[in-house]
């Protein structure tokens, strides 16, 4: 897919969406239809093999639908995981139906940021085709955050034409393989106040160590200082082991 043809294809999607916008905004028009009618063709125009038409083995698929991410002991499923050959994740895309207000609703933004944060991805996307929001996932999400928190780019479908260079240069498969995605991540998402999930985990250990020590003292008044320290360290070691196991999907 050339850049010129991709722009034509996306322009046709925009025109069709605009012509029937009222119908698409109705609640009956669901997420599955949105994905099939608009989101899949949108990313296909950007060069991604959305349905594995190349017949690649599972480990080499470019796009995984309903990928698996462990969050707090539970397994969640982002709608799309875009990957390099060999399975390295680049970014998630979470699809919504057009009746969802992507710009202002808190839950969708928290959801995608939580997925990206847990998977250690730099950015991820929410889109219902009508709206397209890119989020920095290196900043730990909080349920009290606004929908605009950590959002580094926001477009509506009417912006796709004038912003096509951005879409192509950042998210097309061709440009991703040439490093443009990495340049965008480096320039726009590594901001002051961001941290990684590993750094956050390590920072939490000191706080947990104190809480664990206090609890052990309360529950075991007969233990001396060395015994308490041993019990605390043993508990911390188990937490670290569980974290490593989670990262390795064990």
Per-range role (PLM):
Residues 27, 31, 69-70, 101:
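Short secondary-structure transition/capping motifs
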Residues 46-51, 245-250:
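Short helix-capping/linker segments at secondary-structure and domain boundaries
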Residues 22, 26-40:
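Nuclease catalytic cores
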Residues 1-21, 71-74, 78, 84-90, ...:
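Short, basic/polar, glycine-containing "phosphate-handling" surface segments that engage DNA
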Residues 37-44, 114:
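Residue-level detector of alpha-helical secondary structure
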Residues 43-48, 213, 217:
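A general structural signal for alpha-helical elements within enzymatic catalytic domains
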Residues 42, 52-86:
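Active-site metal-binding core of divalent-cation-utilizing nuclease and nuclease-like domains
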Residues 2, 30, 53-55, 91:
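Generic signature of intrinsically disordered, low-complexity, basic-rich segments
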């Amino acid at each position: 897919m050339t850049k010129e043809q991709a722009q034509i294809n996306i322009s046709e999607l925009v025109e069709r969406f605009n012509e029937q916008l009222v119908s698409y905004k109705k609640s009956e028009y669901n997420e599955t239809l949105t994905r099939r009618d608009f989101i899949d063709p949108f990313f296909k125009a950007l060069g991604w093999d959305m349905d594995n038409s190349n017949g690649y083995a599972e480990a080499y698929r470019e796009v995984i639908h309903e990928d698996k991410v462990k969050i707090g002991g539970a397994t969640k499923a982002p709608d799309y995981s875009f990957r390099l050959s060999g399975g390295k994740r680049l970014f998630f895309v979470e699809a919504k139906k057009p009746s969802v207000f992507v710009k202002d609703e808190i839950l969708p933004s928290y959801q995608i940021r939580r997925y990206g944060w847990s998977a250690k991805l730099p950015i991820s996307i929410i889109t219902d085709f009508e709206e397209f929001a890119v989020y920095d996932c290196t900043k730990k999400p909080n349920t009290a955050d606004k929908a605009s928190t950590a959002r580094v780019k926001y477009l509506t479908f009417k912006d796709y034409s004038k912003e096509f260079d951005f879409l192509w240069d950042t998210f097309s498969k061709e440009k991703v393989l040439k490093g443009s995605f990495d340049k965008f991540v480096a320039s726009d998402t590594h901001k002051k106040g961001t941290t990684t999930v590993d750094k956050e985990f390590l920072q939490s250990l000191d706080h947990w160590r104190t809480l664990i020590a206090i609890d052990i003292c309360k529950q075991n008044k007969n233990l001396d200082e060395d015994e308490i320290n041993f019990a605390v360290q043993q508990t911390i070691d188990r937490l670290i082991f569980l974290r490593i196991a989670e990262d390795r999907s064990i």
